[in-house]
Amino acid sequence: MTERRDNVSHAPDAIEGPNDGAHAEDTSPGFFSLENLGVAQVQVVGGTLNGYVIGYVAVYLLLYLTATECKFTTEGACGGRKIYGCKWSGTTCKFENPKCSEGSDPSDSCKNEVAYTSVYSGIFACAMIVGSMVGSIIAGKCITTFGLKKSFIIVSITCTIACVVVQVAIEYNNYYALCTGRVLIGLGVGILCSVFPMYVNENAHPKLCKMDGVLFQVFTTLGIMLAAMLGLILDKTGASKEEANMAGRLHVFSAVPLGLSVAMFLVGMFLRESTATFAQDDDGKADGGMDPNEYGWGQMLWPLFMGAVTAGTLQLTGINAVMNYAPKITENLGMDPSLGNFLVMAWNFVTSLVAIPLASRFTMRQMFITCSFVASCMCLFLCGIPVFPGVAGKEVKNGVATTGIALFIAAFEFGVGSCFFVLAQDLFPPSFRPKGGSFVVMMQFIFNILINLLYPITTEAISGGATGNQDKGQAVAFILFGLIGLICSVLQFFYLYPYDANQDHENDHGGEPVEQKTYPVEASPRN
């Protein structure tokens, strides 16, 4: 296994020509071959679950808002679910404990409780991410202790339990149980985000390794789009929202992750064992396995730092704010919330498909740095500055911001999101990847928490409260996203290089060290 990883090109600045490696092309499996699909299937199931869990927040908040508005026109829809604070009175659905008297002018001191407050929304959005952060911390130990295949089963069982807890929480409208379920499913997702990319990185054919690697993000965006599409269907079709059983719709919406968790269990049961194994004896040097203690944390400080920078690029440039609050953002731009959310997620998926052919031609480093720079510019110059009140008229602002969000998502999916999970592995030597990859994934979840918790609260505060001009807070947020992204892009241009096995090899034999800026591994098309 290690020999395959160390067999890299020695032409630092060259890309293989059409006649180079012809023999490898003749013997390598096709992208859609059964051999390759046997490896890539983990990306299909794991990525889709990861994406659906991410896209869950925006849709759930939208459906819950409808459930708590108490605008139902039938007794069954209103009185049947008193847990949402509604009661049927004569011929009208009313709030069970209204803060406002009939005919009063709703002011800041008179508002019936509808949906979640910005604080509760932020906590709900962060619950899964907190669990994911914990999961990513233990992912490395899980991999070295149980192996990759058994880790799949652990993830599936954890996610299944979490989905059951969420269903119970919906039935009784229990906010704390809902957040508990989200934390549990986040725990599974945190392990998943390290285990699945590592399995593909270690078991896919070298020619297809990076193309298979970006599939995790492709199917993550598919899962996000599926959540948005189902949300649109539940919000717009069938019985009208004024007559619908919204609790039932929330149950249906929350059942999809349960099915994906069961599918993941089946994949884990029948998946072939990974070629990557780790030593389990006290000395860490059992035959046939890599030593997980071969490198100490101190030896990997610089790759760990650059991993944290890539995680910052992934999360602090605004993608999660767009994903979780797409309905609100698109509503501020004059669109229907559920339709706007679906269009954003559909575009997110379509653009991610472009990463597959790009990965066969360009390196992960080239794609990541170029696209992070472009995405940051979109945040700053199209989504931020023009949206600030007074800079542009309403029609111009909406048009420019919509274009900016579309281009930002495209740039992000072309190279930032698609390459991140591959780089999280490639930055480190094979034996350190359980620790190093888990650390990088953990950092992106930490940044994710900051965005999910602070974005709604900060934008509302900057805008002057819930009744203020929300464009102001949104503009300031995207300006900051753009500036952070540009700083990270500069650091990555000078210092982001995947691990080079040849450097260790030459140092072990007394040769001259290979300079970090000329890593031969980066010249290979599979990187």
Curated annotation (Swiss-Prot):
Annotated region described as Disordered, given as residue ranges: 1-22, 506-527
Top-level taxon of the source organism: Eukaryota
Entry's transmembrane regions: 44-64, 119-139, 152-172, 176-196, 214-234, 250-270, 300-320, 339-359, 373-393, 404-424, 437-457, 476-496
Extracellular side: 65-118, 173-175, 235-249, 321-338, 394-403, 458-475
Localization terms from the record: Membrane
InterPro entries, sorted: GLUT, MFS_dom, MFS_sugar_transport-like, MFS_trans_sf, Sugar/inositol_transpt
GO CC terms, sorted: membrane
PROSITE patterns: MFS
Database matches in SUPFAM superfamilies: MFS general substrate transporter
Positions with biased composition (Basic and acidic residues): 506-515
Swiss-Prot/TrEMBL keywords: Membrane, Sugar transport, Transmembrane, Transmembrane helix, Transport
Major location category of this protein: membrane
Membrane topology value: Multi-pass membrane protein
GO MF entries: hexose transmembrane transporter activity
Topological domain spans for side Cytoplasmic: 1-43, 140-151, 197-213, 271-299, 360-372, 425-436, 497-527
PANTHER family membership: FACILITATED GLUCOSE TRANSPORTER PROTEIN 1, SOLUTE CARRIER FAMILY 2
Database matches in NCBIfam families: SP
Reported function: Facilitative glucose transporter.
Record-stated family: Belongs to the major facilitator superfamily. Sugar transporter (TC 2.A.1.1) family.
Name the record gives this protein: Glucose transporter 1B/1C/1D/1F/2B
Lineage, highest ranks first: Eukaryota, Discoba, Euglenozoa, Kinetoplastea, Metakinetoplastina
Gene: THT1B
